[in-house]
Design a protein with these regions (language model features):
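Phosphate-binding chemistry for phosphorylated carbohydrates and sugar-nucleotides
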Residues: 1-155, 168
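Mobile late-domain/C-terminal helix-loop "cap" segments
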Residues: 95-253
């Protein structure tokens, strides 16, 4: 069943694809399909939808591919590269199976660079950029989806069965407007806030505060198995970051 397959030169990614899979989710449920596949406009990203209409993002896809290779002794003692945004659930699940996992900065070019540096071949981003250097030299959504389908066929398993040992940690991401995020993140006040927030989270999760590379914003992400902790810390940190932005703006006048 095809969806959003009538391009006119202007409607690329318009209410469809990996960044807007809502219609696909409904179509999967309506047709009792086993799987939905959403690519982005240039085909280098892919997001999946299970039979219940739930999103399976790039983190879960990387886990599926890594485990399939591991179970068939094809990982060849290598590991997986993710980014600072990759869910902790991936890291913990892979390490439970003795699969090394390392993070790099956001961006498929950074994933590629880290793979080459480590001599590994599998990595990806939550957004659905998946790289398998055994199959292609860049992210390719079609190849990635075929590899997932192959894993389902070879293991005679549904997509949910392939993910039965994978637990995605609850997370929240907010973007806070800031004129010069690259400079703000370097300030003493921001560095102290990051250190304190990391200490407060402890081993219950992860705090990521970074400058956006594409927009004038500070990105704040909290990730924890304890949702109550996220709900408590998120508004507190948002308020503190906004206060620092206000104070720094006053100092620069």
């Amino acid at each position: 069943i095809m969806l959003a397959n009538k391009p006119n030169g202007f409607n690329i990614n318009e209410n469809c694809g990996s960044t807007c899979p809502g219609d696909l989710q409904q179509l999967v449920i309506k047709n009792n399909a086993d799987l939905g596949i959403a690519y982005d406009g240039d085909g280098d990203r892919v997001i999946l939808v299970n039979q219940d209409g739930a999103i399976i993002d790039g983190d879960a896809i990387v886990y599926i591919l890594a485990m399939h290779l591991k179970n068939r002794n094809k990982l060849n003692n290598t590991g997986v590269v993710g980014t600072v945004m990759t869910n902790m659930g991936v890291e913990n699940a892979l390490r439970q199976h003795q699969i090394p996992f390392i993070r790099t900065s956001v961006g498929d070019k950074n994933v590629m660079a880290k793979l080459e540096e480590q001599g590994w071949f599998l990595g990806g981003e939550s957004s659905g950029h998946i790289i398998n250097l055994k199959k292609t030299i860049s992210g390719d959504g079609i190849i990635t989806s075929l590899l997932v389908l192959n894993a389902m066929l070879e293991q005679k398993a549904s997509i949910d069965e392939l993910l039965k040992d994978y637990q995605n940690y609850p997370s929240e991401l907010v973007a806070i407007k800031c004129e010069d995020p690259q400079e703000l993140i370097k300030t003493v006040k921001m560095q102290k806030l990051i250190q304190q927030a990391t200490k407060d989270m402890g081993n219950k999760g992860r705090v990521l505060i970074r400058a956006s590379g594409t927009e004038p914003k500070i990105r704040l992400m909290l990730e924890s198995i304890d949702e109550n902790l996220i709900n408590t810390m998120l508004p507190e940190l948002t308020t503190k970051i906004n206060s620092i932005i206000t104070e720094e703006n006053k100092c620069s006048i």
